């Protein structure tokens, strides 16, 4: 058997090949020496996680409530919602064809809307649809399992239980949702809370009710009937579920006295990201296979996320496929055989011009995210069109000002699978009864926050229809 070998002398042969191309690529007064590392010093700081204080409301299913952002820390880096999901038992008196489970992406869908306000003016917002899109295109595979555990995609919550079975565990299950507000994107855009003593800062939540999140099915109901059943307290479950302890945690940076003094001394403009969600519109491929939707966004749009949501079951919030999930015993198949993307191709029109003409869904689900997003979704039905070279990058890398455009339309042409499933003729479980859909589109835009004289004020009004520039 021969032994592997090499020697240092052979490396000098490589060094001797230096020529014109190498002169262009290597050397010069600004060249980097990879073997003498320079230390990039930072200012002195530490970081500490703390729970935020409740301000208004009751943190419960179906309620609106808020927490106050403390100014005790210098910079707000990240925030996350921590919720205890209670155990729920399906009545043992029911037939064995019944099963109960929580909806997929439970922590996403618990949030009807979350906002951050400065003196009651909304600076940023997001909803469950943005949470679905954002995580699908930004959470890498190496973190996906951990993220799923945080948001409730665990077997003890989303796998169906038979009569007498219990979802969750005694004492409840603690779930965590990272809140993707603009200040959490990078430490360079952290919210300088210590420089804002005259602003009342709040994070506000609107929670969905439990019956919008729990799913009861009865397999004895066969097509053309749907297997979904409305839950009745006292018949199917003994009592309405009640959330356990709910907290909002914040990670703060504490800086030196010198840096703290400088925070309020100069005007500072911060480039931030905001989310706009267009009103959802019914998508009926049986009667109109190529509907035209008018979308009205504003500001510098860097990315568009869109999908057709399958709303056959109102509580299946995160289903963007042609078929409904299929329950078999103690398991559920969220993408059963015969489940496809409801959209075949999409046309984007503005200024009476086809910006994109009948682009196939493979472009929006595979090609565009391959080049312009951190990751490609592993789920059916997610679509991205990025104006930015890399939409996850904080630096401006491409956008279009939708406030300057007129007559913006999106035309998502239905796939043959969507047409068949809408008529209940899909031929496979999950699409063998009539499916119903709605069109969802979300935009991410850039905007500017100005901090001056210890205040954040608005030059133009922030609104749900379009966030405006917030300056002081």
UniProtKB/Swiss-Prot annotation:
<comment type="similarity">
    <text>Belongs to the NCLDV major capsid protein family.</text>
</comment>
<comment type="subunit">
    <text>Homotrimer.</text>
</comment>
<dbReference type="GO" id="GO:0005198">
    <property type="term" value="F:structural molecule activity"/>
</dbReference>
<dbReference type="InterPro" id="IPR031654">
    <property type="entry name" value="Capsid_N"/>
</dbReference>
<dbReference type="Pfam" id="PF16903">
    <property type="entry name" value="Capsid_N"/>
</dbReference>
<keyword id="KW-0426">Late protein</keyword>
<dbReference type="InterPro" id="IPR016112">
    <property type="entry name" value="VP_dsDNA_II"/>
</dbReference>
<keyword id="KW-0167">Capsid protein</keyword>
<dbReference type="InterPro" id="IPR007542">
    <property type="entry name" value="MCP_C"/>
</dbReference>
<dbReference type="Pfam" id="PF04451">
    <property type="entry name" value="Capsid_NCLDV"/>
</dbReference>
<dbReference type="GO" id="GO:0019028">
    <property type="term" value="C:viral capsid"/>
</dbReference>
<comment type="function">
    <text>Major capsid protein that self assembles to form an icosahedral capsid. Represents around 50% of the total virion protein mass.</text>
</comment>
<dbReference type="InterPro" id="IPR038519">
    <property type="entry name" value="MCP_C_sf"/>
</dbReference>
<protein>
    <recommendedName>
        <fullName>Major capsid protein</fullName>
    </recommendedName>
</protein>
<keyword id="KW-0946">Virion</keyword>
């Amino acid at each position: 058997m021969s032994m592997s070998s090499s020697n240092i002398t052979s490396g000098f042969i490589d060094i001797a090949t230096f020529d014109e191309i190498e002169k262009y690529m290597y050397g010069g007064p600004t060249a980097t020496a990879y073997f003498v590392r320079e230390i990039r010093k930072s200012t002195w700081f530490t970081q500490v996680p703390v729970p935020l204080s409740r301000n208004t409301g009751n943190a419960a299913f179906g309620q609106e409530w808020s927490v106050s952002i403390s100014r005790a820390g210098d910079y707000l880096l990240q925030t996350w919602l921590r919720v205890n999901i209670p155990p729920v038992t399906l009545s043992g008196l029911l037939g064995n064809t019944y099963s109960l489970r929580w909806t997929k992406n439970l922590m996403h869908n618990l949030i009807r809307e979350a906002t951050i306000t400065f003196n009651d003016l909304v600076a940023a917002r997001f909803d469950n649809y943005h949470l679905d899109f954002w995580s699908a295109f930004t959470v890498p595979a190496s973190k996906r399992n951990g993220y799923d555990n945080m948001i409730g995609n665990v077997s003890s919550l989303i796998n169906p239980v038979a009569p007498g079975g219990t979802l969750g565990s005694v004492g409840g299950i603690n779930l965590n949702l990272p809140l993707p507000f603009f200040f959490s994107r990078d430490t360079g855009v952290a919210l300088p809370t210590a420089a804002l003593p005259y602003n009342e800062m709040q994070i506000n939540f609107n929670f969905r009710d439990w019956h919008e999140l729990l799913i009861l099915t009865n397999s004895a109901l066969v097509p053309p009937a749907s297997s979904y059943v409305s839950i009745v307290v006292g018949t199917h479950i003994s009592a309405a579920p009640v959330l356990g302890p709910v907290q909002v945690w914040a990670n703060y940076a504490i800086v030196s006295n010198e840096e703290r003094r400088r925070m309020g001394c100069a005007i500072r403009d911060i480039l931030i990201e905001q989310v706009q969600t267009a009103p959802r519109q019914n998508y009926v491929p049986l009667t109109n296979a190529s509907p035209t939707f008018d979308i009205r966004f504003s500001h510098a749009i860097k990315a568009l996320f869109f999908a057709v949501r399958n709303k056959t079951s109102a509580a299946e919030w995160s289903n963007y496929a042609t078929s409904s999930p299929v329950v078999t015993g103690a398991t559920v198949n969220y993408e059963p055989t015969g489940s496809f993307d409801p959209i075949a191709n999409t046309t984007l029109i503005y200024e009476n011009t086809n910006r994109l003409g009948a682009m196939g869904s493979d472009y929006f689900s595979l090609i565009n995210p391959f080049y312009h997003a951190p990751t490609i979704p592993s789920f059916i039905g997610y679509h991205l069109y990025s104006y930015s070279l890399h939409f996850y990058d904080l630096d401006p890398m491409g956008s279009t000002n939708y406030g300057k455009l007129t007559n913006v339309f999106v035309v998502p042409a239905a796939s043959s699978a969507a047409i068949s499933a809408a008529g209940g003729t899909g031929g496979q479980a999950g699409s063998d009864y009539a499916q119903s859909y709605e069109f969802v589109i979300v935009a991410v835009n850039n905007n500017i926050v100005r901090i001056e004289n210890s205040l954040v004020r608005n030059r133009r009004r922030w609104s749900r229809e379009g966030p405006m520039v917030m300056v002081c």
